[in-house]
């Protein structure tokens, strides 16, 4: 029992024992409601004597013979016996009886009107436990009526933090079993079960001769579905459609959109879907009728199956309810089940981009080819990469195999087979090496005259389309100025030669034993590259990405301090692609490489006092998923001593076989080298032992030779951050009390990338009248446990008549920017005494 009630009882008991005359007071607590409380009761002028059913004779003897002077409260935690069985009846004739009407005490203490006291009396058993009673008090119900009392009792049983029937239903459905539900058993124990089902009818329109949670759940999901599916529902479902669809939609929306409860929603949805066999039902409907519905995952399964069929049929003009295929994919990925289906829709969107270019025709001339590649064709490589990136994350790929085969065929036999011969015809032109900047001129073009400290990140095998994704990522940062350009790599396009070309040099050469020298210095390792770099700029250094990525701030500054140029060698893509057992992970490596570089740039710009960055690569790559056949391989045998790779052969004499072209190393390196590099005109490879075969580089193609040059200038002291956001946890759509408490959650813990924010939270009418107090909250919690980021706000509403036809909103404003962050509509239903007609 709440402490204030107990104080009332103690005050009344103390009043019984005033005066000089000895007094005996009998208190028969029929239901032992106060038995727990008696341990804490101390009377000012009396002692407490505990009467037992079997010690009446001794009690009579004690009170009338042993201690005849002390005042006693004789407390009996059981009903008073009949006169014939009560051996203390004569003692009671000269004593007094004390009656503690718990229902009356509770009503007075809580401010419940007399006419609602019978509701308390009916459920008085609930208040026999102090913890339960305190939970009822903690709900802070302001205006009591029959419904509020019953909802409060149900809320307290469920340990809800707010007096809300929607919250009660949420807890019952998500925290309990559908059969043998522990909460329903507790409701029945306190005579609240019938009230629960009547409230379900009032709020959700659910009624049944034998109500059950299973059928309630089906009613909720079928009614919700009926509002968003444009087709007629199956006959067997129609009996479950409720007339209270608005309340049901608001309730299920709150579940599915809550970061805390969305997984519970998914489980309930899957349960109902299985029972109703919804996939079969939806499979018989037009896909146009399903676009707006996200009640069940089965909707997406039906849509995905249809989309795969359209793409395999190369029906890129298909329209679904006004949406093109990529528009539909984007829309569905943003809906509730997008967390589970988003990758599938991304895959389908990428496949669409590939299928759209199935009839690919290359242009002639190197400059037009490069211009077109930079403007559009790079996207074919990017979408192919994205397709497999998401494909590899699918739990089951069987149903996507026909689409995968189509994508693979388009990429290999339509795109690469057409583009690469045109490229290799163009690169033989006399002016080919003057169309775009050359990799061997990188230092002079980008670093020779720089005055500010610059970090150069060389990401091994970052081809142009991956660089374009990095560019797009950095462009999203408002404090970053980003530029993307391109340069033509050396040929053969492999690591040792590409890394050397990126260093400053007067001469670049390949020896007869195929060593690569810059200004006569062997530079196939970090020490050699640093020697070359420091010969041009003593205030420079070469470091490995893995050696600096986890350095503490002080250690990082030690690396950067007094340096003007820092070459950082990053090897994520090539490290995975160049090994036969990991080459199929190369597209994952591309994603990781972009993220690692973004993180490093942000970290150095904030902690390393360095704000100028250039990102480039030694070479690109070609990757095809299907295993190579013998027809994809070229013998490529050279009579001379040769440096052979799957995509190139360097030897004294050029190879003259069909499908092979060649170029002098002197032309590539800008010297008199007479050695020849031979390479496949197509995406085919030479027959060479060792290594993988699907991931290759070293040859002549846009994918291998067009490498990105990205320049980023960061604003000082800036790290890409976002504000810590807040969201509503409590499922509250109707305000029924002038004082209402709600639970919110800070969505993310404050960190290096999530900064604290201050919010103003209050309620508004549609006329912008503020109808509640305004709460301020500073979202600055660093707790990783989401439950510990939940906080409670108390709102006091204006005591006025609210128009049920008007819109009212809970609104959240960012205090710093003054911008509204979000709003949620609520119904104002402040119940006054004369308005009630609940009828239990």
Predicted regions and their residues:
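…; additionally, a secondary subgroup of soluble metalloenzymes is captured
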Residues: 1-454, 463-613, 617-840
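Ligand-binding pocket scaffold of soluble enzyme catalytic domains
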Residues: 460
């Amino acid at each position: 029992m709440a402490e204030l009630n107990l104080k009332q009882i103690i005050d009344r008991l103390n009043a019984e024992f005033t005066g000089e005359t000895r007094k005996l007071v009998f208190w028969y607590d029929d239901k032992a409601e106060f038995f727990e409380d008696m341990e804490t009761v101390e009377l000012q002028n009396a002692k407490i004597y505990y009467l037992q059913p079997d010690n009446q004779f001794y009690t009579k003897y004690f009170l009338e013979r042993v201690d005849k002077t002390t005042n006693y409260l004789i407390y009996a935690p059981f009903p008073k016996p009949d006169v014939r069985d009560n051996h203390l009846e004569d003692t009671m004739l000269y004593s007094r009886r004390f009656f503690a009407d718990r229902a009356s005490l509770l009503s007075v203490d809580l401010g419940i009107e007399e006419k609602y006291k019978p509701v308390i009396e009916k459920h008085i058993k609930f208040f026999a436990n102090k913890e339960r009673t305190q939970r009822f008090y903690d709900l802070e119900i302001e205006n009591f009526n029959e419904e509020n009392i019953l909802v409060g009792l149900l809320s307290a049983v469920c340990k809800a933090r707010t007096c809300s029937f929607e919250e009660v239903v949420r807890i019952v459905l998500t925290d309990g079993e559908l059969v043998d539900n522990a909460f329903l058993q507790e409701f029945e124990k306190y005579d609240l079960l019938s009230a629960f089902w009547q409230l379900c009818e009032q709020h959700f329109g659910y009624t049944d001769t034998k109500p059950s949670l299973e059928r309630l759940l089906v009613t909720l999901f079928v009614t919700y579905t009926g509002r968003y599916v444009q087709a007629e529902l199956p006959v067997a479902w129609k009996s479950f459609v409720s007339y209270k669809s608005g309340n049901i939609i608001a309730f299920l929306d709150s579940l599915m959109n809550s970061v805390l409860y969305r997984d519970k929603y998914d489980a309930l949805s899957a349960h109902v879907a299985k029972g109703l066999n919804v996939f079969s039902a939806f499979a018989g409907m037009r896909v146009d009728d399903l676009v707006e519905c996200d009640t069940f995952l089965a909707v997406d399964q039906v849509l995905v199956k249809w989309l795969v069929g359209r793409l395999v049929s190369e029906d890129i003009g298909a329209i679904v309810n006004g949406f093109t295929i990529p528009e539909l994919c984007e829309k569905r990925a943003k809906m509730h089940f997008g967390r589970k289906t988003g990758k599938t829709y991304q895959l389908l969107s990428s496949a669409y981009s590939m299928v759209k270019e199935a009839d690919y025709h290359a242009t002639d001339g190197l400059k037009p080819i490069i211009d077109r590649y930079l403007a559009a064709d790079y996207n074919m490589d990017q979408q192919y990469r994205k397709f497999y990136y998401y494909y590899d994350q699918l739990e089951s790929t069987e149903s996507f195999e026909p689409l995968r085969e189509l994508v693979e065929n388009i990429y290999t036999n339509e795109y690469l087979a057409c583009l690469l011969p045109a490229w290799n015809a163009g690169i033989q032109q006399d002016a080919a090496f003057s169309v775009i900047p050359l990799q061997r001129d990188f230092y002079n073009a980008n670093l020779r005259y720089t005055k500010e400290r610059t970090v150069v990140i060389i990401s091994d095998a970052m081809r142009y389309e991956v660089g374009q994704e990095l560019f797009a990522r950095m462009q999203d940062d408002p404090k970053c100025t980003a530029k993307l350009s391109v340069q033509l790599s050396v040929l053969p396009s492999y690591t040792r030669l590409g890394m050397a070309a990126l260093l400053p040099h007067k001469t670049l050469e390949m020896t007869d034993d195929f060593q690569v020298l810059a200004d006569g210095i062997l530079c196939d390792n970090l020490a050699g590259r640093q020697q070359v770099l420091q010969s041009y700029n003593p205030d420079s250094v070469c470091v490995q990405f893995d050696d600096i990525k986890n350095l503490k701030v002080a250690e990082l500054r030690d690396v950067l301090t007094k340096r003007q140029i820092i070459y950082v060698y990053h090897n994520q893509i090539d490290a995975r692609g160049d090994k036969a057992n990991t080459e199929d992970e190369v597209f994952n490596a591309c994603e990781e490489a972009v993220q690692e570089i973004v993180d490093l740039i942000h970290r150095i710009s904030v902690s390393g006092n360095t704000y100028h960055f250039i990102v480039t690569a030694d070479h690109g790559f070609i990757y095809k998923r299907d295993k190579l056949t013998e027809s994809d391989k070229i013998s490529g045998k050279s009579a001379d001593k040769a440096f052979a790779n799957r995509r190139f052969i360097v030897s004294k004499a050029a190879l003259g076989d069909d499908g092979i072209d060649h170029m002098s190393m002197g032309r590539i390196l800008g010297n008199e080298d007479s050695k020849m590099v031979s390479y496949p005109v197509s995406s085919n490879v030479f027959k060479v032992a060792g290594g993988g075969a699907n991931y290759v580089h070293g040859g002549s193609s846009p994918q291998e030779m067009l490498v990105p040059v990205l320049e980023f200038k960061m604003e000082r002291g800036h790290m890409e951050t976002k504000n810590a956001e807040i969201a509503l946890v409590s499922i509250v759509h109707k305000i029924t009390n002038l004082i209402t408490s709600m639970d919110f959650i800070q969505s993310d813990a404050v960190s290096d990338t999530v900064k604290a924010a201050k919010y103003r939270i209050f309620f508004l009418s549609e006329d912008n009248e503020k109808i509640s107090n305004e709460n301020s909250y500073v979202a600055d919690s660093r707790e990783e446990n989401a439950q510990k980021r939940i906080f409670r706000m108390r709102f006091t509403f204006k005591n006025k008549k609210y128009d049920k036809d008007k819109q009212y909103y809970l609104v959240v404003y960012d205090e710093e920017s003054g911008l509204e962050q979000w709003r949620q509509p609520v119904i104002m239903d402040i119940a006054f005494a004369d308005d009630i007609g609940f009828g239990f």
